[in-house]
């Protein structure tokens, strides 16, 4: 049980995805610091509060019923955690206005509470989108654990919002308190674009997309070894990012049917725009989601995956293991999961625990491409 006690509420919170014997809490001292800081201001019930990047719903759930709260972030799992934690604590699950980071904000807001994200490009995009959304007398407060708080975060707040005052550290957390000033309107530098030589396509990347400035080296190693001659197979790109694996595969397999899934709303938005730019009106299913959770059993012949190795600042293979399990459930008997991974992660032995046969398709000094058949 993970109990968060704040001046606003006492809540029993869980992380997403749920794990048995979860060692980590669904909140940290930075969440507590933000809530205590807001409570000191004694906000009225009609105060309009925007929460950005609420990891597992701790902030929005605490504020529900005390102020008018909206929540926006780029994580489907974060939005799912908020919903489940509201229900878990007997609160109406639809009472918080949730806006994916891929959609525009609708202010004005009197207070903005920000958890500084791992990707500062996302923070920059969010601060730019606050232009014209702040009420007179508004305050913008960002928080992070000190070890995860780069100086550049304060620089971005100063550039796009106004003067910044850093708080004292409390329980190894710190606040950056920004006072809004009139600023010249800024055009966002996002999305960014880069070109590939093979296949010869241009890819668009919204602010929070992994490796938005250029193709990551794992995918670069994977692309020449994507499965061929798929016919009318049903194919999923699991953790699709900007959609490059599915798009490259679709170009070589014109009859195959594709589903693209990612837990980042901005990744799915990027994948959708890239698919349309390269493949026009060709049909594909795209969704933000918890991997292949909800995918019908035995509904896919092929799964392509470049699995992530971190969730926010937490590093580990638990997300990859979950994806492998989901792929096994979704594949037909005889279907195959294709992955790329760092050699040192030992994915071969992990896959062998779930699949009938695992073979190495190709390898580089750093990566292996594996095929696991159900």
Swiss-Prot record:
Keywords, comma-separated and alphabetical: Cytoplasm, Methyltransferase, rRNA processing, S-adenosyl-L-methionine, Transferase
Subcellular compartments: Cytoplasm
Enzyme superclass (EC): transferase
UniProt key word S-adenosyl-L-methionine: yes
Principal localisation: cytoplasm
Enzyme Commission number, as recorded: 2.1.1.174
UniProt-listed Pfam families: MTS (PF05175)
Origin superkingdom: Bacteria
One GO MF term: 23S rRNA (guanine(1835)-N(2))-methyltransferase activity
GO cellular component: cytoplasm
Catalytic activity: guanosine(1835) in 23S rRNA + S-adenosyl-L-methionine = N(2)-methylguanosine(1835) in 23S rRNA + S-adenosyl-L-homocysteine + H(+)
Function: Specifically methylates the guanine in position 1835 (m2G1835) of 23S rRNA.
HAMAP family per the UniProt record, alphabetical: 23SrRNA_methyltr_G
Family: Belongs to the methyltransferase superfamily. RlmG family.
Name of the featured protein: Ribosomal RNA large subunit methyltransferase G
Organism this protein belongs to: Pseudomonas fluorescens (strain ATCC BAA-477 / NRRL B-23932 / Pf-5)
Protein's gene: rlmG
